[in-house]
Amino acid sequence: MNILIVDNNDSFSYNLKHYVEQFSVEVKVIRGNKLDLNCIDEFDKIILSPGPGLPSEHPILLQTLDKVIGNKSILGICLGHECIYTYFGGNIKICSEIMHGKTSNMKHNGDKLFNKIPNPFCAMRYHSLVGDTDNVPDVIEIISETSNNIIMGIKHKKYDIYGLQFHPESIGTNFGKQLLKNFLLTTEISS
């Protein structure tokens, strides 16, 4: 299996690569500003990494989604998650509490992405933006939230597309490796 990590200038991108490589897959990291959309076909799954800024400041991520929806499995983390949420019509807003290097308990709905992960579990957060719950797109299902109902995980109802606001690649996230493994297996695990 060939995995593409689109690196959005984030220091965690190589932590992500290191974790994913542990599952006997080929992983290539390409900076978003260097990504040639014509090369995407050679990859089985795509991970949109964390990074600074707003989704609108990363048009390559939105172009990537345009090209691969329905053909590739996608996992967006932090910025990648926010891009997926806005791509399908959701709005993002500034967090009431900025979460940089803070952990929170995450509850989940038992989706296959959370296979073998306790409910709740502790995860590391580095973000100042969140998905607005006032306009969740019809095609999006919320699969994880904090105890005060801040969106932490989403999936597309039809396609193999997931987003996580928290950081599974952080050592501060319990079961982060299991989450990434579950993403690699998403087409093989039944819900």
Please name every model-derived segment.
Residues 1-4:
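Extreme N-terminal starter segment of soluble prokaryotic enzymes
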